[in-house]
Amino acid sequence: MSMLNHFFDYKAEVLALDEKAMELCQPYFRHMEEIRDYNQLKMLKAFADTQMSSTDMLGTTGYGLWDSGRAKLEQIFAEVMGAEDALVRSQFQSGTHTLAVALFGLLRAGDTLLAATGRPYDTLEGVIGLDGKGKGTGTLMDYGIRYDEAPLKADFTPDYALIAQKAPGAKVCHIQRSRGYLQRNAFDLDTIQKIADTARAANPEIIIFVDNCYGEFTQTEEPCQAGADLVVGSLIKNPGGGIAPTGGYIAGRKDLVELCAYRLNAPGLGKELGCTLETPRDMYLGFYYAPGVVCEAIKTAIYAQCLLELVGKKPIPRYCEDHNDIVTCFDADTADALIGFCRGIQAASPVDSYAAPEPSPEPGYTDEVIMASGSFTQGSTIELSCDGPLREPYTCYLQGGLNFAASRAGVLLAVQNAYFKD
């Protein structure tokens, strides 16, 4: 009997698929473990270089002036991200909030934001003012900031000729590394570098801005080492390691990070304010553990992709391809299969395993969405979770996994629940 069946009830044919998937995945697991080891050593070196001490984890109150722990954490982030400076704060509520602060920090009335990888993720449409619902609520467009985009080509690759054509009129070139609700692979660093080079050749002053959500530590370098001036991400995704309870980061050129700090706090205050309360230890520890946790999440993705292929699905990316984020997408084909898959993930979660996810309206989304997330941190997507809009072809987006052993059990139960009910 499989060890898995000591704890969950799997059918024999499902366990046979698990055995086959584990065999096929081994070389790709080893590749990710090599990336993990490199990134972990890079992380260790940054901590040592900063001379971080136990007293830096104590936190501050009130204004947060002279907070050495906050300053050292931002120094560590900058070094690991290949950046000049970083803004790492618990006051950032989500990835969307962090992106909004950064965009408002960089753009002024009359400036143009160029989306070089097509329409951004649904929740950012509301920040820009593209969803038609936020007029008068303080969107970028409300402040006289213009929007332009270079749609991806039919094969989901960037349209470099169109980027070159539109870049001269833009202040910021926005690159979304992960897929959002598109069925494409995440962009690798070579693609980010090529977009940056194309935009700069047409406009040397343009700011290359990368939404790095879901992409941190999937490779041995980060977008600042591939042409980005500024990168943005969330601490309840990859860089928080499943431990940081909230927060986000902005890293890149020192002058641009300072502009973002003015937007987060107030003009004239910049990075000098912002108390850390009781969060420093969790933020330090989460970031330190992040390379290992991201490796576990990608091993989960590789396993899920292989398993899905064995049941006839076509996941993106394939298990044998490079991984540039922690997300897997696949067409569940029916609403029942999508709902069943999500309920399987929920049933093998450490938190709220008894809950049965149901499709429902969600702020920032145009269709009903079903979400499964039995996570310790609300909304965390470095923890095993999945979601998808209730529209054909019922595409499911799977991400996260703090450790492979538990995540393997969850994915296997999800596949059984979706495709082996009878």
Go through each PLM region and give its residues.
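Conserved C-terminal alpha-helix-loop-beta "cap" of PLP-dependent enzymes
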Residues: 309-421
